[in-house]
Amino acid sequence: MEKIIVIGGGAGGLELVTRLSRSLGKRQKAQLILVDKSRTHVWKPLLHEVAAGVIDKQSDGVEYGIHATRHGYEFQLGNVNRVDSDNKSIHLDPLLDDDGSEILPARSLSYDKLVIAAGSMSNDFGTPGVAQHSYFLDSLNQAERFHRALLNQLLKKDHEKSFEQKLRIAIVGGGATGTELAAQLHYIGDLAKSYGMPNMSANRLSITIIEAGPRILPALPERITNAAKSALFKINIEVKENTRVSEATAEGFVTDKGDVIQADLMVWAAGVKAPQFVKDIKHVEHNRLGQIIVNEYLQTPNSNDFYVIGDSCGVERPDGSWVPPRAQSAHQMAATVATNLINEAKGKTLKPFKYVDYGSLVHFSKYSTVGSLMGKLSNNNMFVEGRLAKLVYVSLYTFHLLAVHGKLKGLLTLMSRKVSSLLGPKFKLH
């Protein structure tokens, strides 16, 4: 039986293995293995909400082990450190507990076909002090770590007698993650008052977004940037554009002009790069972001048994640009590779990948949602905001749940999430 390994259980990887399990795994036509360093999947566009504490993995997470049992594939917990394409094997680090004790030794897994869906991470560009003093939001563990630090700072500020000193939060990166996190944190400032912190309010927060480029949300149309800046301005979030960070210290971020942006909590949400093991894979070509360059079928040019999807996948478009690292890209790639792996098993022709940009949306907590619709959703680049934008934003997550759980369980999960939001706490205190 052919063994297919998928590395990474993010938006693309989990959807892919779910699709394959229906056609190959449950029918005993292939052995499917998903490898991820986390036990729980949370849709990456929601990680900033985990960090702020408005959702948690209990209600919005998918336990890989349980999902694997229900869908007929195998889950392996571990961090991949090397892919040996010559010998068609992957190598995992020893699995350690929180105290550093070994649970499982280093392992290696052989494959017949490999799909890398490992996602991406923020790029600190080697800026001194960033790794030591900043929080990142690339994984569930990192988001939960920031949330614990946020709770501690809110409690500390709530017990201070002087209201003049604010809780200072600085976020480097004016993309979707940075701007959405800023708005969500402002909302939390007011929400904390109802959850045992009577002296807290949004007025006691000082939130700054630091963007190196000339405008925030640089990948989106300028009209969206202007609407986003207006929404952030209304809730007193400071936006510093054309501001490069040269160093991070215990006091805050230092700009290339020598100014210090003081902060009690520092977040780095800038840049994109592929995981190191992806960059180290031999016999493949990488672009400047470390992504693996693939052919029209999302295979590496020198191997029909090696596919790449999601943020680690480099697909060059006719105009010379690259398919952007977004959830919608991963979703479309997962569908294409699932079709191709199933077609290969049946001896049928492969399907070339065609990226369709449906637009982008940015959700600023309860305050505003702005974006643009393209592709099949609109004949032109249509600007949307307000309720329509929020409806489309929510529908993106709905599509993901349906792809991961199927129609019935996906809809039940949505209903459960709605009931939980109505009856449960709006702010996570642990």
Describe the function of each predicted region:
Residues 132-160, 251-253, 260-332:
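FAD-site-proximal beta/loop scaffold in flavoenzymes
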Residues 29, 71, 75-94, 186-296, ...:
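A Rossmann-like FAD-binding core segment of flavoenzymes
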Residues 75-168, 267:
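FAD-binding core/adjacent interface of flavoenzyme oxidoreductases
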Residues 146-202:
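Rossmann-like NAD(P)H-binding beta-loop-alpha module
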Residues 1-82, 179-219, 267:
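Beta1-alpha1 glycine-rich phosphate/pyrophosphate-binding loop at the start
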Residues 333, 338-430:
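C-terminal, flexible cofactor-proximal segment of oxidoreductases
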Residues 7-8, 116, 172:
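Conserved N-terminal Rossmann-fold NAD(P)-binding element of oxidoreductases
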